[in-house]
Amino acid sequence: MEEVYLERFPEEGNSVHLLDIPSNEKDWYNPEHVNHWDKIRNVRRVVTGAIEVLRQDKVIGSSLEACPIIYIKDKELFDIIKSVDMSEVCITSSINVEFSLSSIPDSCFTLDDVPDVGVICKTAQGKKCQRCWTLNLPIDKSEGDDLCDRCKQAVI
């Protein structure tokens, strides 16, 4: 850490460990953004709860082996959830988000404090990518082709 700091700022000459921690700008705080991510985290709690049921039943070992289907009854919340990659947020191989005009299916996992959200969790299908470990490769991929399209782009 010290060497990196002195290489980046050679004119400083002081130890990085003696510097004051800079304060955040007051205008950086955005309550709307905080509210937006609070809603995403609440939906994520429902998804991880549904995944945990499969894990306890020994159906899956890792969240990457799950393919949740999220049912959302609130249009505003649905739009917020569709604006982010929920498979990345929930650490799953894939995820489906459905807007439900009627009630949420009875077989869904729900949490009392997160209304209008239900999750059905299934096991992900496919072959495991050797780089990111997601199960999204077609099962009939030829031998030696062990990277998903996203990882192929990253290593090129």
Where are these regions (language model features)?
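Flanking scaffold residues of small Cys/His-coordinated metal-binding clusters
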Residues: 124-127, 143
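Conserved C-terminal helical docking segment of ANL/AMP-forming enzymes
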Residues: 84-98
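Short cysteine-rich clusters marking metal-coordination/redox-active sites
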Residues: 129-132, 148-151
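Short cysteine/histidine-rich zinc-coordinating motifs and their immediately flanking basic loops
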Residues: 141-149
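Short functional micro-motifs and their immediate structural scaffolds
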Residues: 134-140, 156
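Acidic, turn-prone loop/beta-hairpin segments
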Residues: 1-50, 54-74, 78-81, 96-99, ...
